[in-house]
Amino acid sequence: GLGGLMYKAINKELIDQHNQSQKSNLDFDFEYLEQKLKKSNIDIHAIKEQIKKFQVAVPTWGVGTGGTRFARFPSIGEPQNIFDKIEDCAVINDLIGFTQKVSPHFPWDNVEDFKELKEFANSYGIGFDVVNSNTFQDPSDGSASFKYGSLTNSSQEARDKAIEVNTQSIDNGKILGSKGLTVWVGDGGNFPGQMSFSKSLERYIDSMKKIYAHLPKDWTVLLEHKPYEPAFYSTVISDWGTSYICAKELGDQAMCLVDLGHHLPNTNIEMVVSRLIDVNKLGGFHFNDSKFGDDDLDAGSINPYEL
């Protein structure tokens, strides 16, 4: 851990030895596939080069133990802090080789010294991708309540605090070498008449403009939509259309993020992606899978063809 010898849950040499023992079988299968694809005029080496460029950032919360609205069950050896999470993410990269960056979440992953965190991660060969902000839980210092919304709250005081969480996340990310911020808000209502549809969206755009103004010139802000949860009657940023309207209003540095679980059942997500590409607003993905909603299952485990 921090300040001591580098810790690896699985030794890289062990992984290499195991891979070496399987190499002859892999080479045989690869050569067979190469000849098979050749008959269709497909160059396997060109595909291999494309795949080598593909990188996925592991979300730091992905190596922790999640929970449901009923309970949370801790697991053996679960990370206690961001340094523990980096160690686990490094093992994932050792195993699969294309997760050289992580995506942290603030304030969950806050530390006193972000320069120290960056150096620690780099010692494991890990860098930092897009950072994420959390305004769906109240600030730990009790300075504001997000019970009735964050960036869209009718209280200016609450909105200002939510904006501050985001600008602070940008500042943290700058030290870590990140180039982007993802904003997902749980703002919404559970009853008809609880909130104004139009005024809440106006407040969201107004708040986002202040966050957007804080972005470095080479950064991107990714707007993430979700149809429901935690609110069920209405969610302010509920679909890709709303996300697109807001991104267009903010400017060229604002893009839309597509989480594969943030859609109503039977939504054609592939077409949503195509539409956003057509209007130059597709900014990124959160890869997962679902049967009903935001199930957060392994990518491709339910809908492999869709993926």
State what each model feature region is.
Residues W61-V63, H105-D109, S133-F136, G186-G188, ...:
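Active-site beta-loop-alpha junctions enriched in small/polar residues
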Residues L117-G125, E249-L250, V273-V279:
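Short, surface-exposed basic-aromatic patches at helix termini and helix-loop junctions that form
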Residues E34-Q50, G127, S133, A144-G251, ...:
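Active-site acidic/histidine proton-transfer and metal-coordination neighborhood
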Residues S75-V91, E112-K115, N166, S198-M208, ...:
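Well-ordered, non-membrane alpha-helical segments in soluble/globular domains
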Residues G1-K174:
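N-terminal pre-domain/capping segments
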